[in-house]
Regions:
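Core catalytic alpha/beta fold that binds nucleotide/phospho-ligands
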Residues: 1-129
Length: 129
């Protein structure tokens, strides 16, 4: 599970298990920007799974923060480049952070505002429930 709490700012989180999806390419074509889709098509199928869920969790965390729902995900552009932090390419002041909670999972947190101090803690007390 993943939980996000903010006292003053809009916040959205998403967590997904990285898994094989037979319709991954068609979902990417439908919900990703042309640049994101092209980026996905240029990498190996194993890398595609991971990249797909990285894009997906970033987009979904953003729409959860804004409350806009899954409409027009292709208009929410994400920059995922090697050796640089992921970035939201949308209007307004939004902070995006990708998380890697465990192997085979992708997660993202999006918070509204500038100069946000984001703190993450792992709490495993619920594991036995």
């Amino acid at each position: 599970a993943l939980c996000g709490v903010s006292y003053q700012n809009q916040i959205g989180v998403d967590l997904e298990c990285i898994r094989t999806m037979p319709d991954l390419e068609s979902l990417a074509r439908r919900f990703f920007s042309p640049e994101e889709y092209e980026h996905l098509c240029l990498i190996s199928s194993e890398e595609q799974k991971q990249m797909f869920f990285r894009y997906w969790t970033c987009k979904e965390a953003y729409v959860k923060a804004t409350g806009d729902g899954l409409v027009k995900l292709e208009e929410i552009k994400i920059s995922l480049t090697k050796n640089q932090p992921s970035r939201l390419l949308v209007s307004g002041d939004w902070n995006l952070r990708e998380l890697t909670p465990t192997d085979n999972f992708a997660a993202a947190v999006v918070v509204a505002g500038k100069n946000i101090n984001l703190h993450c803690w792992e709490y495993s007390a619920f594991v036995d429930y």
